[in-house]
Amino acid sequence: IAAYATAWQTCCSALKPITMSGLPDFLRSHTYPVLPAGISAAVLAAIAAFVVGLILMRLSGIAASISTLAALFILNVVYSNWDKVTMGTASIVGLPTYVTPWIAFAVAGLAMVIAYIFQKSSWGLALRATREDEVAARASGISVYWMRLAAFTLSGLVMGMAGVLHAHFLGTISVDTFFRRLTFITLTMLVVGGMRSLSGAVLGVVVISFVTDILRRMESGVSVSAQE
């Protein structure tokens, strides 16, 4: 959501009337600076997470997981067929590529700081209580529904920031960019590192990224002395 939102705002205004004619006039006819575009796109992702979370956070366990995955598939179908707004399955190109690895590292560090502060706050403690023992959390006066909704919305904001960075790092996006491959790689990172701690999530990212990079290099063959 955030990647497409920033693309609508920063893509060349000469191309949008042709390739994305269904956009509102204030998006179709104008190009906005990358910083306000990125911030507004991340906020839009948080709002979308809040709206979807109003329904999903009433579920728990495997039902919540399946419903969240179903929401991803529904969004993919909508974006894949919304030709006049998202260009369907085609790629949106010409985005300004202002994101460098150092900028990405800085924002990733900011995301970890936000997660750490939330983890150590009273809200983080209450959220962990809803995970460990939902009945006891309710008995303690914790609103399980609203705590989970707040965490889901905050996650939407952080993932929106990631989508903006991804779009302006590659300079092009498509619906396939954010579908099955990226989803399952992200889940794999969490499973490998551990989903119950911030350090585990970071470790999972490092390990899977390292393994992925090694395997990508091996695709072209491994050099042994002067021969491959």
Regions found by a protein language model. Name each.
Residues I1-E228:
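Transmembrane alpha-helices and adjacent helix-loop boundaries
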